[in-house]
Amino acid sequence: METGHGIKYRQLHIEDYLQEIPAEQGRVSGVYVHERITGDTDTNTNFWTNNLLDTILRSDNLNAAYKRVKANNGSGGVDGMQVDELLPYLRQHRDELVGQLRRGKYKPNPVRRVEIPKEEKGKVRKLGIPSCVDRLIQQAISQELTPIFEEQFSDNSFGFRPGRSTHDAIKRCKQFAEEGYVYVVSMDLQAYFDTVNHSKLIEVLSRTIKDGRVIPLIHKYLKAGAMKDGGFHPTEEGVPQGGPQSPLCAN
């Protein structure tokens, strides 16, 4: 079986083992957050955005990403690898995988397209299930990007954000009502995840991310395509629902 980066994957059955993480990192609602980002100066933030790939590929960040993927479980992607097979694979191929990422040679797999019927007749929600290796890499990316971009998001935004829930949004609405606001606008961005403009997204990300190795990697994931019924479908727009980095990119 081939992975997206051309390495043959052999199914192995070894008891789970994970190297110790040197320092415990902060988490908010189960999402990994680097304490070094919050409350830091612009100079420090610029340092991390300029050297972002190095922090993404740090052992402690990859270990935390593996733990999150393992905890979430979920089904496998197009290469057939299951979550419980990921650790044995990483033991054998981690250095080669990290090397390909550093050199910009890594090629993500297409996502596995799954369609979930909506309540509205004839409508479906399109999910894109990444391979386990791609899920790990996306999770590692998301863990580093989240604390950086959280500082830029609106305080009145609650969707797909760590430490924020529907109940928090309701409390904010109640607060506005008590402050005298009397109008509510209700709207739905139809097929939002499926129609995110790639060029605009890359432009927005590039304003903050100054590491020229990270933007191309994210772009590869956006353009990786999808497999459905044995056929390849290119992705010219949208971020696939089902990948760890998609909620952050959508926001």
Question: Predicted segment positions?
Answer:
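Amphipathic alpha-helical blocks
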Residues: S75, E85-P110
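Glutamine-centric residue-chemistry signal
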Residues: Q138-Q139, Q143, Q241, Q245
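Glycine-rich active-site/cofactor-binding loop and its immediate structural neighborhood
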Residues: K121-Q139
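Amphipathic alpha-helical interaction elements
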Residues: D54, A71, S75, T146, ...
